[in-house]
Amino acid sequence: PHFGSVIVDIERDPALAAAVPVRVRVTEALPRYAGAGAGYSTNTGARVELSYRDSNLRKRGWEFSSGLRIEERRQALFADVFLPPRGRDRDSFGALYEASDLEGLKIDSQALGAARTTLRGDIETQLALRLQHENIEPAGAPSRSTNTLSANWTWKKRAVDNVLDPTSGYVLEFQVGGGSKTLLSDQDFLRFYS
């Protein structure tokens, strides 16, 4: 389902201009990919990162994507699994761990999530659930822990000339989400985004 490269070529003979044959060469992407990188940022310091992707996890058509980023003042580890599409729906789930120590604020966060994305023409919707635990330690202030179970619904319309390389059109997005004390959250909340 994934391509490493696609090369399209034509015969450049002007005599064939009315009906020129087109040659298409497709190379399938490797089913597994590992990557490594290093860099430096002025606000988080030196970093190294590793990534791994498997486009056919457990030989079931599941896409697996994971990454580890270690910076001097921030670290992150994630793993996501995308199940094969079923009709217009695509389900996914994942886990995330993040830790940071920036400007006197230490944050340690773990999250589990699941989502269903549905595509109908140029309209994409997503319903997502996320369970998150955070430890927050501000310098000179008491630390605290928070727990959140949130639900989020996203509506997105893409009216562009080319989804992969748009040159004209627009994208509209609207999100609504929230959590409740009665359902594992420390606070009742509602949020909107557009």
Region locations from a protein language model:
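Transmembrane beta-barrel strand/turn architecture of Gram-negative outer membrane proteins
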Residues: 171-179, 187-194
